[in-house]
């Protein structure tokens, strides 16, 4: 997703290897986030996982010891059981919802974990142009 972390490259492997040798440094985990696992086309996710495995292998070859590896989000847990590692980060599926209509819903039978119920407490008419809500968000 390009948010944080290192690029998949030999230079990154060298940098991480140097960092791992610093005093008082313990590499706890390495992770990625399957950016498109919830889409019908799974090619991006397969390619992303291959890059992840390449980095893992290169770091291990360089003697970098990492305790935990993690790729899975909700869609990854559902659609990619063969790509699991040490940890998984279930997001929306914790609440019993599928991440999209493009995942294999028959693979995991999710049950809603909560329900949002609301009641109308007050109705009033206001003149056009009246500022409503925090910061006058609505007019």
What is each residue range found by the language model?
Residues 108-109, 137-139:
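Short proline/glycine-enriched turn/loop segments at secondary-structure junctions
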Residues 128-137:
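Short, solvent-exposed secondary-structure boundary/capping segments
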Residues 1-119, 123-127:
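Active-site loop/helix belt of alpha/beta enzymes
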């Amino acid at each position: 997703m390009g948010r944080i972390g290192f690029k998949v490259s030999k230079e990154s492997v060298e940098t991480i290897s140097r960092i791992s040798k610093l005093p008082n440094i313990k590499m706890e985990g390495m992770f990625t986030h399957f950016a498109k696992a919830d889409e019908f086309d799974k090619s991006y996710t397969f390619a992303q996982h291959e890059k992840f495995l390449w980095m893992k292998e290169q770091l291990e070859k360089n003697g970098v010891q990492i305790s935990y590896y993690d790729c899975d989000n909700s869609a990854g847990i559902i659609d990619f059981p063969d790509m699991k590692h040490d940890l998984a980060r279930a997001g929306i599926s914790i609440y019993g919802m599928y991440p999209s209509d493009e995942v294999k819903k028959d693979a995991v039978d999710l049950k809603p974990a909560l329900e949002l119920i609301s009641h109308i407490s007050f109705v009033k008419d206001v003149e056009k142009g009246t500022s409503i809500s925090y910061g006058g968000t609505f007019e």
